[in-house]
């Protein structure tokens, strides 16, 4: 039986998620056509006296996961629909059907709340290439990982030498901002090349653009739809966002001019050069294109590697086995894709952390371009905005003792013929929707797994690490977001690595 639910989604920074397009959320109702024969779904956190959804917003911020579970548990019949804000929430049992059906459009699923029609929010291509670039550009980057592995390793070395230092004495670092800067520098090597990836001005943009855009979006969405095209010109956060974008354009332009002057020059791949060739003369905004790629990749990957590193520090018995695995994989040569692919324990630790600490509680945001009848009889009316919950990630029938962190869980799963297909970090399936699923699954997941493995290899082989227990590092849940305490710290000190990276 299909299960789906509905919730009022609060409007606020704490409940804004960013998935493949800097997705912001709204509490606007989406009414079905009067001619629809499908009954309008009830709402889980709706109160008859709550005319302005104030109670609904507070409920959602405080216990979004519980409300999603409640709604899914109350789905009674195959045609039942429930909706939060403008989103219909489906169970992951329908992830295969939604993910493989072309009638569910991803771009239209996020466009209504992206504010792309407002100046400063249009972090997409313009004209004929609108919406068409991020996926192929990311896929093109993924296909060149064999050639990008060593550059990624070089940037990791450069960053750690500067930021973590070569000191053999223990010293503390605040995890998230440091890992965000590391991720920005490494990924920017693939996006904008070796010069800009170490430019402090570009790295400042890469690490702050998402938060600036989120803040501006929240400010705009406090106003009615009719007023938004006017008020955004005067809101300080929106003016700051536009200035931020202009600085990015100014930094990108000299590098783009160099590419135009030497189109046949044999050089390391960058998405900046690839997109210029892909455009084939069409007018586009190179700065916005890079911000789109950088923001999406940096924000989610930084969050992921922060959580993984803290998990490792919370389970120090994993450190030496992870080191041993890395030493064995790298022995006899530098870091290469083939070596990274042998690190099954590291991948298991990464996936287990991701399973327990998803950045976003919902996935697969879609728009129904026509009425669709899903398996089991669930009817999705044309024009419905929907998303998929992921209760299977905590299903004890799939993951024994599901609330417990088990770094070896997916190592054992690889050895089980029936479940081996669930083990790889980049494999999408209904039991783990962190990268989406189906035809429009995140193409950047292959880049993320390599970048994170490279970072962990350098960190674990070159440094001793331990958690600063006096500083809070617990998970913080707010709305749909699950993040580590931003003040979480670790202690590090330089050690002599057993093999050269």
Swiss-Prot record:
One Pfam family in the UniProt entry: p450
Superkingdom of source: Eukaryota
Glycan attachment sites: 298
List of residues binding heme: 442
Record carries keyword Kinase: no
GO molecular function: heme binding; iron ion binding; monooxygenase activity; oxidoreductase activity, acting on paired donors, with incorporation or reduction of molecular oxygen
GO cellular component terms attached to this protein's record: membrane
Bilayer-spanning residue ranges: 11-31
Main location: membrane
Its job: Cytochrome P450 monooxygenase; part of the gene cluster that mediates the biosynthesis of notoamide, a fungal indole alkaloid that belongs to a family of natural products containing a characteristic bicyclo[2.2.2]diazaoctane core. The first step of notoamide biosynthesis involves coupling of L-proline and L-tryptophan by the bimodular NRPS notE, to produce cyclo-L-tryptophan-L-proline called brevianamide F.
Protein name: Cytochrome P450 monooxygenase notH
Protein source organism: Aspergillus sp. (strain MF297-2)
């Amino acid at each position: 039986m299909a299960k789906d639910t509905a919730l009022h989604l609060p409007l606020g920074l704490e409940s804004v998620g960013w998935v493949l397009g800097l997705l912001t959320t709204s509490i606007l109702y989406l009414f079905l056509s009067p001619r629809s024969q499908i009954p309008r779904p009830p709402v889980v956190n709706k109160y008859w006296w709550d005319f302005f959804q104030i109670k609904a917003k507070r409920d959602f911020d405080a216990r979004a996961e519980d409300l999603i579970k409640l709604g899914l548990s109350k789905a009674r019949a195959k045609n039942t629909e429930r909706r939060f804000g403008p989103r219909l929430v489906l169970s992951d049992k329908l992830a295969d059907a939604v993910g493989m059906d072309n009638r569910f459009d991803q771009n239209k699923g996020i466009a209504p709340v992206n504010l792309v029609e407002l100046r400063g929010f249009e972090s997409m291509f313009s004209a004929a290439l609108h919406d068409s670039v991020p996926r192929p550009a990311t896929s093109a980057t993924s296909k060149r990982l064999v050639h990008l592995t060593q550059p990624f390793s070089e940037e990791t070395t450069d960053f750690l030498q500067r930021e973590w230092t070569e000191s053999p004495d223990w010293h503390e670092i605040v995890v998230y901002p440091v890992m965000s800067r590391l991720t920005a520098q490494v990924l920017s090597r693939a996006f904008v090349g070796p010069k800009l990836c170490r430019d402090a001005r570009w790295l400042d943009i890469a690490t702050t653009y998402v938060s600036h855009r989120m803040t501006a979006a929240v400010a705009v969405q406090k106003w009615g739809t009719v007023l938004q095209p006017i008020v955004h010109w005067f809101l300080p956060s929106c003016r700051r966002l536009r200035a931020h974008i202009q600085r990015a354009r100014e930094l990108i332009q000299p590098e783009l001019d160099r590419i135009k002057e030497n189109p046949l020059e044999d050089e390391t791949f960058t998405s900046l050069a690839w997109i210029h060739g892909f455009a084939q003369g069409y007018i586009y905004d190179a700065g916005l294109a890079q911000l789109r790629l950088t923001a999406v990749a940096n924000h989610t990957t930084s969050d992921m590697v922060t959580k993984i590193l803290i998990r490792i520090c919370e389970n120090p018995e994993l450190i030496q086995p992870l080191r041993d695995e890395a030493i064995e994989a790298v022995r006899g040569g530098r870091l290469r894709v083939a070596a990274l692919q042998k690190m099954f324990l590291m991948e298991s630790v990464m996936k287990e952390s991701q399973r327990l600490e998803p950045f976003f509680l919902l996935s697969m945001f879609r728009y129904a371009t026509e009425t669709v009848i899903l398996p089991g009889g669930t009817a999705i009316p044309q024009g419905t905005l929907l998303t998929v919950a992921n209760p299977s990630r905590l299903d004890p029938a799939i993951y024994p003792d599901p609330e417990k962190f088990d770094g070896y869980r997916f190592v054992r799963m690889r050895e089980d013929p029936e479940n081996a297909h669930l083990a790889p970090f980049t494999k999408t399936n209904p039991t783990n929707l962190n990268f989406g699923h189906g035809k429009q699954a995140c193409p950047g997941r292959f880049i993320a797994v390599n970048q994170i493995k490279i970072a962990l290899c350098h960190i674990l082989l070159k440094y001793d690490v331990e958690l600063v227990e006096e500083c809070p590092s617990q998970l913080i849940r707010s709305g749909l977001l699950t993040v580590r305490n931003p003040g979480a710290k670790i202690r590090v000190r330089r050690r002599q690595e057993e093999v050269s990276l």
